[in-house]
Structure formats: C-alpha cells, structure tokens
Amino acid sequence: MMWRDALSLVEEEDPHMKVSLGSSDMGVSAHLQSSKTGTTRFFTSNTHSSVVLQGFDQLRVEGLLCDVTLVPGDGDEVFPVHRAMMASASDYFKAMFTGGMKEQDLMCIKLHGVNKIGLKKIIDFIYTAKLSLNMDNLQDTLEAASFLQILPVLDFCKVFLISGVSLENCVEVGRIANTYNLTEVDKYVNNFILKNFPALLSTGEFVKLPFERLAFVLSSNSLKHCTELELFKAACRWLRFEEPRMEYAAKLMKNIRFPLMTPQDLINYVQTVDFMRTDNTCVNLLLEASNYQMMPYMQPVMQSERTAIRSDSTHLVTLGGVLRQQLVVSKELRMYDEKAHEWKSLAPMDAPRYQHGIAVIGNFLYVVGGQSNYDTKGKTAVDTVFRFDPRYNKWMQVASLNEKRTFFHLSALKGHLYAVGGRNAAGELATVECYNPRMNEWSYVAKMNEPHYGHAGTVYGGLMYISGGITHDTFQKELMCFDPDTDKWTQKAPMTTVRGLHCMCTVGDKLYVIGGNHFRGTSDYDDVLSCEYYSTTLDQWTPIAAMLRGQSDVGVAVFENKIYVVGGYSWNNRCMVEIVQKYDPEKDEWHKVFDLPESLGGIRACTLTVFPPEDNTGSPSRESPLSAP
C-alpha cells in the first residue's frame, strides 16, 4: 500500500512525470509513465542479452536445434550452428541464408575461404562475444573475419596488432596490415617506423621492409634524426641485400635529398657508388644537387621535394622588436611550440632589428631593412638584407636595398620580394624596390603616387594590396593594388576607418585589416580596435569583430587558417605589449591565446617549417653545403 500511495502522490504532483527505478541485484531497471488513462510500467533486463547468448552457446555445445553445419576449407571438421545466430552477426551469412543462394537450403556448407582455426574463432566469438588472440592464431582469425565480414573481430585484431608493434615485428605487422587492408594499422606501422628508423637500421628487420614502405619512409618529412647521407647508405644496404632489388635503385634514390648533402659527401660517398654513375636517373639526381648548390641565392625559387626541409613542424615564428623597458632592439628568432605551450629559440640574427620587413619564399625567411637602434623617426634605418635557412638553422647576407627604409611593407609575390614605401633619415618614401633571387639584386619598379609609411600589405591572386598608413603626417584609409606584370598601381575602395601601423593578411579570398592607430582629435594617438576585410570580387569592405586590446606595429601571421597578431604597441596604454591575440575567421571571434616572453614593439611574425630545437639535440649535425670548406 505504501508503494501504491507513493505512486499516487507522484501522479497528483505531475501527471506526466517519469519515475526511474532500478535493482542492481536483480539486473532489472524500470520506469513509470503516468497519463490520464493510468500508469504504465516499463521494465528492462540488464542481463537478458548475455543470458540468451549463453543459452545459444549451450545449445550449440550440446548440438541442440542446430540447423546447419559449417565445414572449413582446409579440412573435414564440422561445426554445427544455428542459421539465425550466424545471420544476425554476419552480413555474409545473412545474404547466404536469406538471399536465395544455393546454400540457403543446404544442411552442410563448405567455406573454402576460411580455415579450421579461423572458423572456430569466429563461431566462438559469435556465441560468446569473447575472443582470444595471439600471433599464432591472428592471421587465421583475420582471414576468417575479413571473409565472413565480422567487423567486431576485425576491430579487435587491429587493436591487438597496434598494441604489440615493436622493432622485432613491425615489418610483419605491416605486411599483415597491407594484406588485409587494415588502414589504421598500416598508418600506425608507418608512424612507428618513422619514429624509430635509426633503431630499426641496427636490426636485421630493416632489410625485410618492402620497397613501397621503405620508399614512403624515405620520402617523408616526418623522418627524424637521420642525415641524408645516412639515409642514402641505408637505401644502398637494402638494395644490395638481394640482387633483384637493384631494379628499384632509381625509384628509391628519388627520395634521397642529395641537394642537402655537402659537396664532400656527394664526392666521397655517393659518386663512388656504381649505379649512381651508370643509371641515367641517378646521374641526373647528382646533376640536380650540383646545380642547386652552385646557385645559393636562387635556392628559394628552385625548391622541390628533394630540396625541402625534412620536417613536419610548421610553427608561428617571431623576429626582432624593441624591448619595453630598456628600449633595446632584439635579434631573437623564436618559434612557438603549441604542444609544450612555450617559446623556443632558433638561431638569432647577426644584428638586431625592429620595424623591419619579413617575407618567406620557398620556406626561406628574408629580413629586410628596419632599424638596429631605437628611433621613432626612422633616422637609423638600414638597407641590409639577411636570409634564414631553417634546414641548417643559419643566416646569410644577400644583396642590400637601394635605399635604407623602415616603417615599410615587404611582400613575397611570384618568387620576388617587394619593399614598399617607408621612411629613413631623408624623409618619407614613395619608391618601391623588387628583389630578384635569381640575380641577387634589387631594382626599382613603379612607385606609389604619394609617399607612405606605417602602411600594411598582403598578396592575393598574383597582386599586392597596400592599405592605410601615414602620408605627410596624415593617416590614410586608401587601398592600392600593384600588378607586377604591368608594373602599375590602381586605386581600390578605401577602408571604412583611417589607420596606420596596422597589419594586413589574407585568409581564403578575404583580405583582412586589423588594429593599428590614428589621431584622436588633432594630435593624440588612439588605438584602432575595429577590423574589416576586403572582397576583391565586390571591391568592398565588411566590418568584423573588434580586437580585445589595441596593437600597433605588430607581427601578423596566418597559422592553420587563424590570424595571430603578435606584440606591438598600445597607444591607449602607452607601452609595448606582450599579448598574442588570435582571430578565427569562421567564428568571427577574438581570443587572447598566449604571451611573448617579453613586451616587444616593432616585432614581425610569419609561419615557417623548422627543425624544433629539441630535434637538434642528439641528432646528427646538419652541415650547410654553403658553409662547407
């Protein structure tokens, strides 16, 4: 009565309320649903499915109610089973027993694609939901599961294989994965070998690698802790293990990055190998390496798979800037490690820089102009240009600008650099210079109509766009477009807000303008928090979410389709800032993500593929061909 009374109270309080009841001891759960017509009780057994499964398995063991006998392809042993049970667990058996096939009416069926061990494993799993695996029965089980389309067993086999990969069995596991099209396992084996390749070289398993997997490994940017010479020697060892393998020599050598070896190594260790002198493809690979090394200034526009850095680590990189407290100019080159959430140092510049220009061609970083000493008027502008090679973590000097310049914009466009406007001790500049890496020289192109400094720029569709800036002490909102093919400037729709010392970048087909500053009143500077993007198709501007905090004279980079605005100066707070803000174009949202190690104004940023500093620890040295004696 007490139970019924409790139910009535619930119904009176809320006639639509559900009440859940449970009994772990009985393996039963229930809920009550009330309505105007009365109370309906729903019960669920938590043990029913396992009891039914156990019951079917007992019937199978005792040979009761079995209506078909399965015979493996490799013997005469028979396995009495229930058609309904097999069809419920396998699309293969469902089609066999219900699809009008001749086996539908047979009492004994021979399965030619399955052996005794595999068939027993599959039947045991279907009736018990349990599976025991070891390397002795794995392949038989895999073969049966693939043939009979038992997906859970295939998944268990994948887990078993992945969990047991080692140096001793990775080649065999890879073979099994390839045979049965186990994509996840195959990918895991590749990653394991890439991570442990130096250790694998010291085992007898290395020479057992199939050609396809070895070629993949040698072509991968994820292969670490090996020099190209070591990879070449490993490839030669694999080729010589069996004479028929020599037919793969040219195909395998295409994956070795000969241009990154020193000339001495090419002469002493590569050209002395017979097939490198006799095979036409291999000879051409050596010629390619020689030509590449003979033209150091041209290398950024000669990049190929064999000249690229062997690294998969692309990061946000910052360079230079002026320190907040001491007003000392930095020469630090840093990358941000997203996994470790920390900044790590790369090779510093030879000289400090701020308010400089940076651009990337072929994953080479160019640093152009700027200032080495703190001066707000640009009187200490320089004309020197340096290039950073992340493959060797080294800098080299290239041809200087025709004019010293700072507060300018630098773009990389169609394999050239364009330095636009700026200022120096002589005043504001309207001139534009173009750097040709093939000639290692700067030449003038069409200048702007008016001198500009503190402007920003970006490239899209083979054109360079320049926005805002300062002309004759007046902030601008104009947008200009430069076509390098016609050497002409054209005017586009102006921004909605005047701004200078802002930043600009391209994401997809949109040209974003962010931050900066302008006059508040007649003489006081004010942060510009508003942002907007330009559509080249519509020739119009659209506002987007405002920045969280003002930043001028910053570094800007696009990384994984997000915009990062780094450091700079806040006019509202009258100080350099260390903040890094990220804008998500898809969500139209700003977030503060992390900080610089110190507050830096006039800093610059980009994305670059590098060797993270820890990859250099304990790794073979990477000697630049340019610095080899």
From Swiss-Prot:
The lineage of its organism: Eukaryota, Metazoa, Chordata, Craniata, Vertebrata. Kelch repeats lie at residues 315-363, 364-415, 416-462, 464-509, 511-561, 562-610. The keyword Repeat applies. Signal peptide: none annotated. Substrate-specific adapter of a BCR (BTB-CUL3-RBX1) E3 ubiquitin-protein ligase complex required for mitotic progression and cytokinesis. The BCR(KLHL9-KLHL13) E3 ubiquitin ligase complex mediates the ubiquitination of AURKB and controls the dynamic behavior of AURKB on mitotic chromosomes and thereby coordinates faithful mitotic progression and completion of cytokinesis. Disulfide bonds: none annotated. Residues 170-271 form the BACK domain. InterPro entries: BACK, BTB-kelch_protein, BTB/POZ_dom, Kelch-typ_b-propeller, Kelch_1, SKP1/BTB/POZ_sf. Residues 66-135 form the BTB domain. One of its GO terms (molecular function) is cullin family protein binding. Keywords: Cell cycle, Cell division, Kelch repeat, Mitosis, Repeat, Ubl conjugation pathway. Component of the BCR(KLHL9-KLHL13) E3 ubiquitin ligase complex, at least composed of CUL3, KLHL9, KLHL13 and RBX1. Interacts with AURKB. It holds the Pfam family BTB. This is Kelch-like protein 13. It comes from Gallus gallus. Pathway: Protein modification; protein ubiquitination.
